[in-house]
Structure formats: structure tokens, C-alpha cells
């Protein structure tokens, strides 16, 4: 009997730092290892029939971590985009980001916008990365937008 795989898979990227700490390594080593696994998953997903992949990569709560860890995570995101952009585009992967970009480094924001534009018409795999994202934060931002629109009579 063959297994039916879902067309949309969501992964909460949690535990990489703890995994590394439990092995006596720096937390960022775990985050780098997690990014390597993501690369493998993104490559395999389309061949498995998965069309949508959502990665919850950095929540609004992650800002509470040490400055070193936050900066390290942002560097890993930037390096991933930089190293994988060509391969993703050639493989037909559309990459999008959700979450509040306003706190992110402007250079990272430009990189994100660039890869989104470059891969916009592709559809072999729809890769969505949630960065600076939180369900509660998303609701608050949506309500604020609605309130602003109502105040303007829209």
C-alpha cells in the first residue's frame, strides 16, 4: 500500500539550538545544521509531490534570544538566500516570506524582496518562510490595518 503524502507541509524549525547544546556545541552550529536539512527538504519536496512548503523559521519571540544568536540566525538566512537563489530559480521554486519585515536588517529585506521577485512566476514548489512571524502578532497587525482603514472611511 503506497502512502499518500500531503501537498502542503509546514515545519516549525524548533529545537536546533537545544540539539547542539545537548552535544556540547554552540547553538548556532545547530541552526546551521537545521539550514542544511532545509536545503535537503526543499530539494526533495517537489519529487515527492509536495507543492507547498512552509517553514516557520523565526518567530517574534525569537528576538528575546541573545544578540549573538539573533545576529547569527539573520546571517544564516542571508547566506541561505545568497547561496540558494540560483538553484531555487532553476528548480522552479517560488520563494515567499511572511511576517513583519520592519525589524529586519534593510540588506536582508532587499535580499528577500529580490528572491521573491526573481521566483515570482515559478510553481514547481511554493516555499514560504515565516520570519519575524507570530500568530498573535499577525492578528494584532491585521486589526490595526482594519482600524486604520475604518478611520479613513475605507
Predicted regions and their residues:
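Flexible, compositionally biased loop and terminal segments
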Residues: 1-154
Amino acid at each position: 500500500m503506497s502512502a499518500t503524502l500531503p501537498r502542503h507541509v509546514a515545519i516549525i524549525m524548533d529545537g536546533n539550538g537545544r540539539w547542539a547544546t545537548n552535544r556540547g556545541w554552540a547553538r548556532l552550529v545547530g541552526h546551521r545544521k537545521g539550514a542544511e536539512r532545509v536545503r535537503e527538504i526543499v530539494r526533495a519536496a517537489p519529487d515527492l509531490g509536495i507543492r507547498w512548503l512552509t517553514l516557520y523559521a523565526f518567530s517574534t519571540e525569537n528576538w528575546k534570544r541573545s544578540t549573538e544568536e539573533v545576529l547569527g540566525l539573520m546571517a544564516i538566512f542571508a547566506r541561505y538566500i545568497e547561496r540558494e537563489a540560483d538553484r531555487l530559480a532553476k528548480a522552479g521554486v517560488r520563494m515567499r516570506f511572511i511576517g513583519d519585515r520592519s525589524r529586519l536588517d534593510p540588506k536582508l529585506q532587499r535580499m528577500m524582496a529580490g528572491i521573491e521577485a526573481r521566483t515570482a512566476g515559478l510553481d514547481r514548489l511554493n516555499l514560504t518562510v515565516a520570519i519575524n512571524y507570530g500568530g498573535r502578532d499577525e492578528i494584532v497587525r491585521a486589526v490595526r490595518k482594519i482600524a486604520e482603514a475604518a478611520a479613513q472611511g475605507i
